[in-house]
Amino acid sequence: MATPHINAEMGDFADVVLMPGDPLRAKYIAETFLENAREVNNVRGMLGFTGTYKGRKISVMGHGMGIPSCSIYAKELITEFGVKKIIRVGSCGAVREDVKLRDVVIGMGACTDSKVNRMRFKDHDYAAIADFDMVRNAVDAAKARDVSVRVGNIFSADLFYTPDPQMFDVMEKYGILGVEMEAAGIYGVAAEFGAKALAICTVSDHIRTGAQTTSEERQNTFNEMIEIALESVLLGDNE
């Protein structure tokens, strides 16, 4: 049944949902990659769609910015609409010199300065990691398309405008591939409620050099990342 944030019914969503932060990107994905896509949510402008990709039912829905927002939608999709897998498809900023604009990053683990997973885990550190099979399928899907991907830790930040830029030095030292704002929260929600999750990000800007893509490019042209996510779902069905 509908929730305060999602005006859909059981069965409206597929068991796998791709989740970009931007609801307009969700609309773009549905219109570009899915067949027979129909709108299944529009509460607060957080658009959601369900259609098919190569005959496979798949949904896509925005999750907003930051862990509090994405956690609401991820939790409700899992507990109220039967979603089993969530794939975050979004952007991240690079801090390492060897990570370039438009590189595709697969978040095997997600560090964070947020306390949400400590709140879930009795104030202990929780290792927020992606589902291994989903990681493997994404890597295999990328290889099949001859797309090079980076696999490793990302960092989910609570603040977009950080007051502590020296933290980027620490991230670089520890090999963080990209900085975003949601993956650790989605991984925590998935673990708490028995689902699986993965974050795939395209590098939209470089925090060190200032290089960046345009907002229009971030909405419309990260097609390789979306194709990897969709093809990984099909590989998962064949396991």
Swiss-Prot record:
UniProtKB keywords: Glycosyltransferase, Transferase
Keyword match Glycosyltransferase: yes
Family matches, as Gene3D superfamilies: Nucleoside phosphorylase domain (3.40.50.1580)
One term of GO molecular function: purine-nucleoside phosphorylase activity
Annotated positions for site Important for catalytic activity: 218
Binding residue positions for phosphate: 21, 25, 44, 88-91
Alphabetical list of SUPFAM superfamilies matching this protein: Purine and uridine phosphorylases (SSF53167)
Active site, renumbered: 205 (proton donor)
Binding site for a purine D-ribonucleoside: 5, 180-182, 204-205
GO BP term, pick one: purine nucleoside catabolic process
Pfam families: PNP_UDP_1 (PF01048)
Catalyzed reaction equations: a purine D-ribonucleoside + phosphate = a purine nucleobase + alpha-D-ribose 1-phosphate; a purine 2'-deoxy-D-ribonucleoside + phosphate = a purine nucleobase + 2-deoxy-alpha-D-ribose 1-phosphate
Gene Ontology terms: cellular component: cytosol
EC numbers: 2.4.2.1
HAMAP family assigned to the protein according to its UniProt record, in alphabetical order: Pur_nucleosid_phosp
Similarity comment text for this entry: Belongs to the PNP/UDP phosphorylase family.
Function text: Catalyzes the reversible phosphorolytic breakdown of the N-glycosidic bond in the beta-(deoxy)ribonucleoside molecules, with the formation of the corresponding free purine bases and pentose-1-phosphate.
Subunit structure: Homohexamer; trimer of homodimers.
Protein name in UniProt: Purine nucleoside phosphorylase DeoD-type
Organism: Pectobacterium carotovorum subsp. carotovorum (strain PC1)
